[in-house]
């Protein structure tokens, strides 16, 4: 004699989030207010016999099961549980407003630096000495750094005499469109960019009387050096 198994698709209820002291009797007691109950069981661990925190309740009819599932998060034995039809699966418990909070995601580049301070900028070697790292400047000082000329002043040129600077400036006017200096040998310049050199005398434009006077003064300052033609006589 074969018995037909009853369809429990719409009558079997999954109950999750149960406290560990909930028993079959206490689970049945809670759901019996919604209608007739065919079965109420708390799933336990086979080895320890303790509750695993969930169970199943089978109601006698579909209407009773719908009434039992009307509240998806009832309080059972002092703890908020989650109730749903078993064929739909477990339904997560709804968090109360104020408990859930979001954390703003930060860029990986900002996490490594406190307060999002911008990183130091390394300028191309065509503008400054290789290896020099210039820190980020404030917006108020950004206007001063927009000029294409970088003024190398201070102690960097203290070891050079006034006569040497004047001679270098006078010789540079014959071949280059910008002033050159022995101190600038370690610096590389690109087309259209130059650097200003502090000079003890006022440089004049090429081709003027002032430029000729400056060149004569520089030649007089270096009178101890032999003219370039002596080098040619030595080779002969």
From Swiss-Prot:
The protein's predominant localisation is: nucleus
Induction comment from the UniProt entry of this chain: By p53/TP53 following DNA damage (at protein level). Up-regulated during embryonic stem cell (ESC) differentiation into cardiomyocytes.
The answer to whether UniProt assigns keyword Nucleus to this entry is: yes
Subcellular locations according to the entry: Nucleus; Cytoplasm
Bridged cysteine pairs (disulfide): none
In this chain the RRM domain maps to 11-88
Q: Which Pfam families match?
A: RRM_1 (PF00076)
Record's keyword annotation contains Transmembrane helix: no
Query: Mind listing the GO biological process terms from this record?
Result: 3'-UTR-mediated mRNA destabilization; cell differentiation; DNA damage response; endocardial cushion development; mRNA destabilization; mRNA processing; mRNA stabilization; negative regulation of cytoplasmic translation
User: From the Swiss-Prot or TrEMBL record, what is one GO molecular function term?
Assistant: mRNA 3'-UTR AU-rich region binding
The record's keywords, sorted A to Z, are: Cytoplasm, Differentiation, mRNA processing, mRNA splicing, Nucleus, RNA-binding, Translation regulation
Q: Which tissues is it found in, per the record?
A: Expressed in fetal and adult heart and skeletal muscles.
User: At the top level of its lineage, which domain of life is listed?
Assistant: Eukaryota
* Record annotation: effect of changing residue 181 to D: Increases p53/TP53 expression
Q: Where is region (Necessary for interaction with EIF4E) located?
A: 175-199
Looking up SMART domains in the UniProt record yields: RRM
Q: Which cellular component appears as one GO term in the record?
A: nucleus
Oligomeric and partner information: Interacts with EIF4E; this interaction prevents EIF4E from binding to p53/TP53 mRNA and inhibits the assembly of translation initiation complex. (Microbial infection) Interacts with HCV mature core protein; this interaction, which enhances the interaction of Core with 5'-UTR may favor viral replication over translation.
What does the function comment of this entry state? Answer: Multifunctional RNA-binding protein involved in the regulation of pre-mRNA splicing, mRNA stability and mRNA translation important for cell fate decision and differentiation. Plays a major role in pre-mRNA alternative splicing regulation. Mediates preferentially muscle-specific exon inclusion in numerous mRNAs important for striated cardiac and skeletal muscle cell differentiation. Binds to intronic splicing enhancer (ISE) composed of stretches of GU-rich motifs localized in flanking intron of exon that will be included by alternative splicing. (Microbial infection) Promotes hepatitis C virus (HCV) replication over translation through the inhibition of viral protein expression. Decreases viral translation by linking viral 5'- and 3'-UTRs, blocking 80S ribosome assembly on the viral IRES and enhancing the interaction of the mature core protein and 5'-UTR.
UniProt remark on domains: The RRM domain is necessary for mRNA stability and mRNA translation regulation.
Q: What is this protein called?
A: RNA-binding protein 24
Q: Which organism is it from?
A: Homo sapiens
Name the encoding gene, please.
RBM24
């Amino acid at each position: 004699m074969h018995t037909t198994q009853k369809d429990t698709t719409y009558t079997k209820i999954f109950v999750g989030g149960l406290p560990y002291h909930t028993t079959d009797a206490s689970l049945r007691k809670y759901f019996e207010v919604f209608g007739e109950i065919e079965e109420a069981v708390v799933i336990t661990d086979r080895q320890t016999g303790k509750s695993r925190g969930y169970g199943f309740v089978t109601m006698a009819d579909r209407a009773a099961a719908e009434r039992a599932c009307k509240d998806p998060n009832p309080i059972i034995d002092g703890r908020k549980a989650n109730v749903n039809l078993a064929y739909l699966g477990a339904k997560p418990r709804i968090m109360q407003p104020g408990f859930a909070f979001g954390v703003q995601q930060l860029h990986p580049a900002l996490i490594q630096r406190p307060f999002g301070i911008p990183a130091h900028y390394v300028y191309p070697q065509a503008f400054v000495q290789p290896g020099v790292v210039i820190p980020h400047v404030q917006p108020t000082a950004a206007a001063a750094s927009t000029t294409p000329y970088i003024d190398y002043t201070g102690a960097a040129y203290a070891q050079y005499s006034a006569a040497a600077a004047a001679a270098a400036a006078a010789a540079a006017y014959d071949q280059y469109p910008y002033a050159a200096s022995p101190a600038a040998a370690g610096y590389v310049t690109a087309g259209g960019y130059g650097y200003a050199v502090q000079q003890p005398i006022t440089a004049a434009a090429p081709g003027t009387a002032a430029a000729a006077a400056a060149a004569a003064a520089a030649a007089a300052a270096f009178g101890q050096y032999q003219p370039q033609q002596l080098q040619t006589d030595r080779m002969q």
